Every structure is written in structure tokens, then in C-alpha cells.
């Protein structure tokens, strides 16, 4: 949970006394109209909650809806189920009740209003995982409740968004491969299907550039179609690299299976890294080195922001980027000169 904002914090930002802040927020005389408006605007931006009001609002119970696209619930796609569980647990600890709705691919295309929204059952909505901008725009117009995006952002339809640092994370794990002696490194993920995949590709690309390498089309390998349906098998390139950077652990798992079918051993012949540091136990017989997503921190921020919006204490919209960690396991072999 974020640290509570105090009057002193606002005063320090504006270079005025705490007494001036108190007078402005309580409507007392002694503060110019211009300064009063400036203080109120900054207090709202910083998420300040007046004493007493905060306690009263925190004791309220809210209903939070979670909307998850159908294609994130396909076989073995466990990351979003786990993230939903973490969000739900976090919300329950904040005195909230959580309901989930799975949005079918057809309903997304048809711009169908979710039942959670149509039935006015919720006080706030979490959109978990990327959806089409047209659908998000419809939600913005029809859902008269605060909305927070989790694990994606949208430039066309801006709401508060909580994401992992995909750009830096993939940059870091690609550099990790370079530190292990790899120079021929491929990327596995269909570009432009989601902003997350594209951001991760750009992090991979930055690492290559800094090592004097250029991206090659032959080593940009798709893992799903443009409708975001994941392939069961990853098609290997004709000319093989020594390592693959995958946009997620599930894709890394499928790649490892494809490699083994073609007679390659991981990591003895080819190294593979992923992203998420989460995969269903027993799904892959190789422990995948990965850039881990801090789900707990993402959930805390998402619930905290949504609560402030439901309570009316936050109206500005922002992008919250959560750092992750390198999870070094057994899918990378160091190359020796």
C-alpha cells in the first residue's frame, strides 16, 4: 500500500507552510484564491486524504470487477489466472469483494458491454491484459465507474495503468545472455499484437545495438497470430542462433518443446530465456531463466489506485511501472571461447 500523503508533503512541494496548506484545504481565510486552487490541485494529484475522511472511506466495502479476455484463459495460460488471484487476495484484504468476467473474442469484436458493467454490479473495474482500443473506448463511455488497466497500457484510451517494466526487463535479460558469451540471439514474439510484446522486443533490440549487433528478420519469430491466439508449436529458423529471448515463459516452454522435437538440447545446444518467472509446475522439464514480474507489487498499486478513485480522492491518470527481477535457473549455457 502506498504511503499516506500528509499536509507537510504538499507544503514541501510548494515551498509554503503547513498552516497555509491547512487553511487552503479547510476553506479558511488567509490564502489567496490562486494559491488555494494550486494547493487543492496538487493535493488531488498527490492523493491526499483528509484525516477522518480517510478512516470513514477505508471502512467502506466496494465491489471490484475484473475483466479478462478469453484468449488469456487458453490451455496452460496460467500467468493471468495467477495475477487475478493476487489482485483478488489484495482487494479482499482491503475490504473489497471481487468478481471476474471472461470476455469472449466475439464479444470483444462486437463491442458487447460486459455483464458486470451492464448490471451495475461494481464500483470499479480492473481490465486485466490488453484489449482492442475500440473495446476500451466503449468501456470508457459505458462504464460509469473508475477503471484501471493491469499489465498493459493504451495510448488511444488512457486510464490508470499498472505494468511491469517490459522494456528494461528484456533489455536486462538479453544483456545477461551477452554476459554468457552469446552473440547470435533471436527474439520470439509476434510484434504489434500487444504493446507488452513490442516493448519487450525494443528492450531486446536496445541490448543488441549496444553490443554492435543489428536485429535480423530471420531471428524475429512469431508465437501467435494477429488475433493473439498462441501457436502450439514454434517454427524454428533455418539458420539457428545460440540463444532465444522469449516474450513470456509460456512461449519459452513451447519453444523448448519444438527444439527438442528437432533434436536440440536446452541448454547444451541452445539457450532459452523467458519473461514472467511464472509457469505451471510440470509444464516444462527445463527450469527457465526469466525476468520475473512482481505480481504482488502490481496488485497493491492497482487496488490502491482503484480505491482512491472509487473514494473520489484521485482524478488524474498515470502510468505505474513496476520493476521486476532476474530469475537465473537452468536454461542458459555459458559459451566459452
Language model segments and positions:
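Alpha-helical recognition/docking segments in bacterial nutrient-uptake
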Residues: 1-2, 59-175, 234-239
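Flexible loop/turn connectors
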Residues: 231-337
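N-terminal helix-turn-helix DNA-binding module of bacterial transcription factors
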Residues: 1-60, 336
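Short helix-capping segments at alpha-helix termini
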Residues: 93-94, 208-215, 238-239, 261-266
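Short acidic capping loops at alpha-helix termini that bridge into adjacent secondary structure
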Residues: 183-184, 215-218, 266-272
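Hinge/beta->alpha junction and helix N-cap segments in small-molecule ligand-binding domains
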Residues: 69-82, 100-108, 162-172, 188-231, ...
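Short acidic/polar active-site loop segments enriched in Thr and Asp
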Residues: 17, 49, 123, 182-185, ...
Amino acid at each position: 500500500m502506498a504511503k499516506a500523503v500528509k499536509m507537510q508533503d504538499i507544503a514541501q512541494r510548494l515551498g509554503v507552510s503547513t498552516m497555509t496548506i491547512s487553511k487552503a484545504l479547510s476553506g479558511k481565510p488567509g490564502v489567496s484564491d490562486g494559491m488555494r486552487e494550486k494547493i487543492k490541485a496538487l493535493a488531488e494529484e498527490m492523493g491526499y486524504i483528509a484525516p477522518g475522511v480517510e478512516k470513514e472511506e477505508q471502512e467502506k466495502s466496494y465491489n471490484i470487477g475484473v475483466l479478462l479476455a478469453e484468449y488469456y484463459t487458453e490451455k496452460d495460460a496460467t500467468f493471468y489466472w495467477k495475477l487475478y488471484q493476487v489482485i483478488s487476495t489484495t482487494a479482499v484484504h482491503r475490504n473489497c469483494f471481487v468478481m471476474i468476467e471472461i470476455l469472449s473474442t466475439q464479444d470483444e469484436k462486437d463491442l458487447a458491454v460486459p455483464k458486470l458493467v451492464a448490471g451495475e454490479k461494481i464500483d470499479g473495474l480492473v481490465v486485466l491484459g490488453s484489449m482492442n482500443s475500440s473495446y476500451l473506448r466503449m468501456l470508457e463511455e459505458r462504464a460509469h465507474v473508475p477503471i484501471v488497466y493491469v499489465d498493459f497500457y493504451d495510448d488511444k484510451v488512457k486510464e490508470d495503468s499498472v505494468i511491469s517494466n517490459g522494456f528494461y526487463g528484456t533489455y536486462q535479460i538479453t544483456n545477461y545472455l551477452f554476459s554468457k558469451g552469446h552473440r547470435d540471439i533471436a527474439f520470439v514474439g509476434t510484434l504489434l499484437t500487444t504493446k507488452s510484446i513490442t516493448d519487450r522486443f525494443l528492450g531486446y533490440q536496445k541490448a543488441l545495438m549496444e553490443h554492435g549487433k543489428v536485429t535480423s528478420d530471420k531471428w524475429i519469430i512469431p508465437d501467435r497470430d494477429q488475433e493473439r491466439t498462441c501457436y502450439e508449436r514454434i517454427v524454428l529458423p533455418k539458420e539457428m542462433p545460440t540463444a532465444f529471448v522469449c516474450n513470456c515463459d509460456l512461449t519459452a516452454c513451447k519453444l523448448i518443446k519444438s527444439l527438442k522435437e528437432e533434436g536440440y538440447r536446452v541448454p547444451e545446444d541452445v539457450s532459452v530465456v523467458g519473461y514472467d518467472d511464472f509457469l505451471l509446475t510440470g509444464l516444462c522439464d527445463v527450469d527457465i531463466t526469466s525476468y520475473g514480474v512482481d505480481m504482488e507489487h502490481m496488485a497493491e498499486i492497482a487496488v490502491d489506485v482503484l480505491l482512491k478513485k472509487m473514494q473520489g480522492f484521485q482524478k488524474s491518470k498515470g502510468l505505474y511501472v513496476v520493476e521486476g527481477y532476474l530469475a537465473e535457473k537452468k536454461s542458459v549455457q555459458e559459451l566459452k571461447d
